[in-house]
């Protein structure tokens, strides 16, 4: 139930503590990393979000994706029983 790191980080001579001490560091992005692209942001996407009608295509994608399950549920709820 408790994190092993929290249990390991608790000192034995002090009262038992379940809080793990974390240190966050900030470093510059390593360009040799597979998670950072030297071409810049949006270079790894399979579509171009800077096109003229991207907003419309994205809106239609969301409407179809979120609207289809709702429309199917409503249709199945109100269809006549056979």
From Swiss-Prot:
Topological domain (Mitochondrial intermembrane) residues are 76-82
Q: Which GO terms describe its biological process?
A: mitochondrial electron transport, cytochrome c to oxygen
Give the pathway annotation: Energy metabolism; oxidative phosphorylation
Which keywords are on file for this protein?
Answer: Membrane, Mitochondrion, Mitochondrion inner membrane, Transit peptide, Transmembrane, Transmembrane helix
Q: State the compartments where it is located.
A: Mitochondrion inner membrane
Asked if the keyword RNA-binding belongs to this entry, the reply reads no
Q: Origin, by domain of life? A: Eukaryota
Recorded GO CC terms:
mitochondrial inner membrane; respiratory chain complex IV
TM segment ranges:
53-75
SUPFAM superfamilies according to UniProt: Mitochondrial cytochrome c oxidase subunit VIIc (aka VIIIa) (SSF81427)
Pfam families named in the record? COX7C
Membrane side Mitochondrial matrix: residue ranges: 32-52
Disulphide-bonded residues: none
InterPro entries given for it? COX7C/Cox8 (IPR004202), COX7C/Cox8_sf (IPR036636)
Give the residue range annotated as the organelle targeting sequence: 1-31
Membrane topology, record value:
Single-pass membrane protein
Key word 4Fe-4S present: no
Q: What is this protein's function? A: Component of the cytochrome c oxidase, the last enzyme in the mitochondrial electron transport chain which drives oxidative phosphorylation. The respiratory chain contains 3 multisubunit complexes succinate dehydrogenase (complex II, CII), ubiquinol-cytochrome c oxidoreductase (cytochrome b-c1 complex, complex III, CIII) and cytochrome c oxidase (complex IV, CIV), that cooperate to transfer electrons derived from NADH and succinate to molecular oxygen, creating an electrochemical gradient over the inner membrane that drives transmembrane transport and the ATP synthase.
Subunit field text: Component of the cytochrome c oxidase (complex IV, CIV), a multisubunit enzyme composed of 11 subunits. The complex is composed of a catalytic core of 3 subunits Cox1, Cox2 and Cox3, encoded in the mitochondrial DNA, and 8 supernumerary subunits Cox4, Cox5a/Cox5, Cox6, Cox7, Cox8, Cox7a/Cox9, Cox6b/Cox12 and Cox6a/Cox13, which are encoded in the nuclear genome.
What family is this?
Answer: Belongs to the cytochrome c oxidase VIIc family.
Q: What is this protein called?
A: Cytochrome c oxidase subunit 8, mitochondrial
What is the name of the gene encoding this protein?
A: cox-15
């Amino acid at each position: 139930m408790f994190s092993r790191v929290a249990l390991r980080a608790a000192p034995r001579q002090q009262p038992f503590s379940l809080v793990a001490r974390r240190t966050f560091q900030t470093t510059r992005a390593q360009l040799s990393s597979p998670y950072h692209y030297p071409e810049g942001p949006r270079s790894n996407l399979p579509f171009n979000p800077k096109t003229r009608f991207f907003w419309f295509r994205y809106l239609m994608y969301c409407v179809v994706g979120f609207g289809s399950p709702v429309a199917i549920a409503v249709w199945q709820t109100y269809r006549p029983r056979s």
